[in-house]
Amino acid sequence: MTVRTKELYPGVPYFLLGHSMGSFYARQYLCEYGHELDGAIIMGTGFQPKALVQFAKTLCRALAVFHGWQYRSKFVANMSFMGYNKGLEGRTTHDWLNRDQAEVDKYLADERCTFTFTLNAYYSMFSGILRLHDPAFLAKMPKGLPLLFLAGDADPVGEQGKGVQRAIQSLKDAGVQNIECKLYPGARHELLVETNHQEVFEDIGSWLEKHLA
């Protein structure tokens, strides 16, 4: 993808932004193709326990034996988001996404956001997340690649910042050196449409300008 885009638009810098599920895929992409990029922004990420991810992957494989890989399991879906709304119960099941209730309601009303993944999709996702626990895989990431981690300190995906810090530490342990991180007080998961989204955009812009100078 990067090679093709560079053919169409040569001579310009390339930065990758990965948010939420995309942040996990972005981290994998950086290990394989980070040498093609000038930097990356990792937003709303986390670092789930390896044993839990392995269990979820095994469960998907077992369920597929009986239902097929295209089966959409509510159980696996609920397990994947278990506990995210803890402490916010009462209004919707997804208030963990955002302090802006209107944005949460827009999300819930959009069928492109609320469909259930197939077992195959979950299996692939869990397989990818497991790669991020492999030090040899992480060591493939360019050591000096500029990285910016952004998250809300009330985002359950990143365990209120603790999972974000574990993700960063895993990269530092692999020798990746050029990492910055900012946690936004009170912010939840969807930073680009959170109540402080203007601050987030300004921080992204400032970071990009610094690395384009």
Predicted features along the sequence, with ranges:
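Conserved alpha/beta-hydrolase "acid-adjacent" motif
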Residues: 156-166
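Short beta-strand/loop motif that positions the catalytic acidic residue
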Residues: 149-151
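Gly/Ala-rich beta-loop-alpha elbow adjacent to hydrolase catalytic centers
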Residues: 17-22, 26
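Alpha/beta-hydrolase-fold enzymes
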Residues: 26-112
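Active-site nucleophile elbow and catalytic-triad environment of alpha/beta-hydrolase enzymes
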Residues: 118-139
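Catalytic active-site module of serine/aspartate enzymes centered on a nucleophile-bearing elbow/loop
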Residues: 174, 178-213
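Conserved acidic catalytic loop of the alpha/beta-hydrolase fold
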Residues: 1-12
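Short, proline-enriched alpha-helix->beta-strand connector loops that line the catalytic pocket
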Residues: 141-147, 177
